[in-house]
């Protein structure tokens, strides 16, 4: 059995998908689920699901399937969501506040302890019960609330400064939405999400589809 840290990143990224499906199955009181059923729910092949889970041990019985509650609890522990994860969002603009609202409503495994901004129009407000602090209070709140994950939704020019301040408070996981190349110590993991690049990549595929349709129309 491979240890948690040895699983490929592609496997790790599929685990939350499995967890979401398992959450829904538990809510529907489905006690046993097969890899074939998980395949239908996730879009991944049954073989891929079995291989992914095998990285972390044996969870089911051949011909019987997986105990849904047990598998869900194991996946929670593997990801690290069996304990509350505190999150700070830096940048309380449209993206930051939307991210906070979504997590409060849809993500029971994390707690957004605060949004941070410099605008007097929003500092002191509450977003879905999440307080908006001034950026000057970032390190104090991060330290007090034992924040483990930072979400960066500030303009690119300010993103590196935010990284440096979060790293100084021993935050080891950062989700960055700013279109900037950021640097951090080797033991800090940064996941970059550039929505503009994602949209442009999608347009490329949409263009191919449109070109194909245009060609067919000319035939």
Curated annotation (Swiss-Prot):
Keywords: Cytoplasm, DNA-binding, NAD, Repressor, Transcription, Transcription regulation. GO terms for molecular function: DNA binding; DNA-binding transcription factor activity. GO terms for biological process: negative regulation of DNA-templated transcription; response to redox state. It is found in: Cytoplasm. The keyword NAD applies. Residues 17-56 bind DNA. Pfam families: CoA_binding, Put_DNA-bind_N. NAD(+) binds at residues 91-96. The keyword Ribosomal protein does not apply. Its main location: cytoplasm. HAMAP family: Rex. Belongs to the transcriptional regulatory Rex family. PANTHER family: REDOX-SENSING TRANSCRIPTIONAL REPRESSOR REX, REDOX-SENSING TRANSCRIPTIONAL REPRESSOR REX 1. Modulates transcription in response to changes in cellular NADH/NAD(+) redox state. This is Redox-sensing transcriptional repressor Rex. It comes from Natranaerobius thermophilus (strain ATCC BAA-1301 / DSM 18059 / JW/NM-WN-LF). The gene is rex.
């Amino acid at each position: 059995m491979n240890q948690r840290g040895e699983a490929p990143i592609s496997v790790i990224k599929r685990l939350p998908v499995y967890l979401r499906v398992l959450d829904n199955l538990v809510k529907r009181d489905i006690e046993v689920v097969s890899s074939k059923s998980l395949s239908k729910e996730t879009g991944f092949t049954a073989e891929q699901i079995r291989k992914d889970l095998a990285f972390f041990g044996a969870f089911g019985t051949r011909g019987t399937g997986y105990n849904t509650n047990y598998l869900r609890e194991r996946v929670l522990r593997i990801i690290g969501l069996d304990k509350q994860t505190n999150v700070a969002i830096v940048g309380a603009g449209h993206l930051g506040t939307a991210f906070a609202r979504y997590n409060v409503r849809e993500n029971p495994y994390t707690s957004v302890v605060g949004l941070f901004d410099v605008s007097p129009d929003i500092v002191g407000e509450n977003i879905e019960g999440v307080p908006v602090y001034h950026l000057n209070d970032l390190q104090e709140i991060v330290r007090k609330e034992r924040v483990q994950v930072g979400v960066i939704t500030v303009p690119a020019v300010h993103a590196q400064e935010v990284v440096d301040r979060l790293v100084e408070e021993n935050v080891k996981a950062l989700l960055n939405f700013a279109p900037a190349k950021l640097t951090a110590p080797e033991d800090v993991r940064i996941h970059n999400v550039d929505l503009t690049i994602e949209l442009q990549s999608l347009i490329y595929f949409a263009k191919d589809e449109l070109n194909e349709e245009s060609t067919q129309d000319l035939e």
